[in-house]
Amino acid sequence: MESILESRSGHWAGGPAPGQFYRIPPTPGSIVDPXSVLYGSPITRTQNPMVTGTSVLGVKFEGGVVIAADMLGSYGSLARFRNISRIMRVNNSTMLGASGDYADFQYLKQVLGQMVIDEELLGDGHSYSPKAIHSWLTRAMYNRRFKMNPLWTT
């Protein structure tokens, strides 16, 4: 038995120590480090939404628009958070409501808030139209989905 182990030790010389992993260098332009996929390193993107919300309703009528959402955040099947808002005022003409993962909604809220601040700093009197916000959101969500790191919101 010892002779088998000794012969193998020469074959595997230079490998990782017991309990360690081989480090595969990333290829130029790769999105994901192959070592993390092959050897079970921590995944740095959301695989399953944790805190989710469900219902958002928008109604258009002759005098304007009404948007409503429930305030429940579910942690799996547990009704965990009972007072979270999933509606955001982007500017004077645009509101955003989101269902799905609450963390992704918070991310979108932060990015859109910064975009609006940057636009207001120009001081030209213009702001983002609802069509411009919609266009940006569709491109941003498609871009993330294309990179296999989707935003889990609708």
Curated annotation (Swiss-Prot):
One of its GO terms (biological process) is proteolysis involved in protein catabolic process. PANTHER family: METALLOPROTEASE TLDD, PROTEASOME SUBUNIT BETA. This is Proteasome subunit beta type-4. It comes from Sus scrofa (Pig). The keyword Signal does not apply. Keywords: Acetylation, Cytoplasm, Nucleus, Phosphoprotein, Proteasome. Residues 1-45 form a propeptide. Its main location: cytoplasm. The gene is PSMB4. Non-catalytic component of the 20S core proteasome complex involved in the proteolytic degradation of most intracellular proteins. This complex plays numerous essential roles within the cell by associating with different regulatory particles. Associated with two 19S regulatory particles, forms the 26S proteasome and thus participates in the ATP-dependent degradation of ubiquitinated proteins. Belongs to the peptidase T1B family. GO terms for cellular component: cytoplasm; nucleus; proteasome core complex; proteasome core complex, beta-subunit complex. The 26S proteasome consists of a 20S proteasome core and two 19S regulatory subunits. The 20S proteasome core is a barrel-shaped complex made of 28 subunits that are arranged in four stacked rings. The two outer rings are each formed by seven alpha subunits, and the two inner rings are formed by seven beta subunits. The proteolytic activity is exerted by three beta-subunits PSMB5, PSMB6 and PSMB7. Forms a ternary complex with SMAD1 and OAZ1 before PSMB4 is incorporated into the 20S proteasome. Interacts with PRPF19. The modification N-acetylmethionine is found at M1. The modification Phosphotyrosine is found at Y102. It is found in: Cytoplasm; Nucleus.
